[in-house]
Regions:
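A structural signal for beta-strand and strand-to-loop patches characteristic of beta-rich domains
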Residues: 1-200
């Protein structure tokens, strides 16, 4: 009857920047369970081409072994390569029953498997925060379905507020922009890219 919780400080980091998260063990009532061991594993998600299809694999495993405490306990993972990482935390109660929690985070500079079809593909945007106020700097991770590519970032609120041209030499890049009072609330961001994509 014990559960493990994970909280990340931000959903992505630059390649080479350690990824930090907090780990906590609780019971059914949400109360902390100090002294219980928790194992946290992180793996990078990679894609292996076999029999005409790309298959997701987990590589470069890292382990952070902690002991639950009254307050959240920190874990840190290296990010030597870009891409998507999966974190799995496991806690085992006194009866030997395991409970797991999973989350994913992104590291700039990773690749995605190419598509077999020629179609309009989506650019994925991941903000570093859910909300921004005037005076802050917004940071967006741009995940492109192909590269190299040229892109245009457009910020809209009752018309176009700002545009920025970007060049992608990898599948991900980071865009930073200072948030002014005129951009809030409810600003929209759009990224359009053009380039070439490999086909299998």
């Amino acid at each position: 009857d014990e559960y493990v919780g994970l909280k990340m400080k931000r959903p992505f980091v630059e390649k080479g920047t350690p990824f930090d998260l907090d780990v906590i063990g609780v019971d059914l009532d949400g109360k902390s369970v100090p002294g219980v061991p928790i194992e946290v594993k992180a793996s990078r998600l990679d894609f292996e081409y076999k029999h005409g299809h790309y298959k997701e694999t987990r590589v470069d495993p890292q382990t952070c072994a902690v002991t639950a405490a009254a307050d959240p306990v920190p874990c840190r993972f290296a990010t030597d390569k870009g891409g998507e990482y999966e974190v799995v935390a496991t806690i085992v109660d006194a009866k030997g029953r395991a409970n797991q929690t999973k989350l994913t985070f992104w590291v700039s500079g990773g690749d995605t498997p190419p598509s077999r079809d020629v179609k309009q593909e989506r650019v994925q945007l991941i903000p570093d925060k859910k909300e921004y106020a005037g005076g802050e700097t917004a940071e967006l991770l741009v995940q492109a379905p192909f590269y190299p590519a040229e892109g245009l970032v457009t910020w809209r609120r009752s018309g176009i507020v700002k545009t920025e041209r970007i060049s992608l030499t990898s599948a991900t890049t980071t865009v930073k922009v200072p948030v002014t009072d005129g951009m809030v609330p409810n600003i929209a961001v759009q990224v359009d890219i053009v380039g070439m994509a490999a086909r299998t």
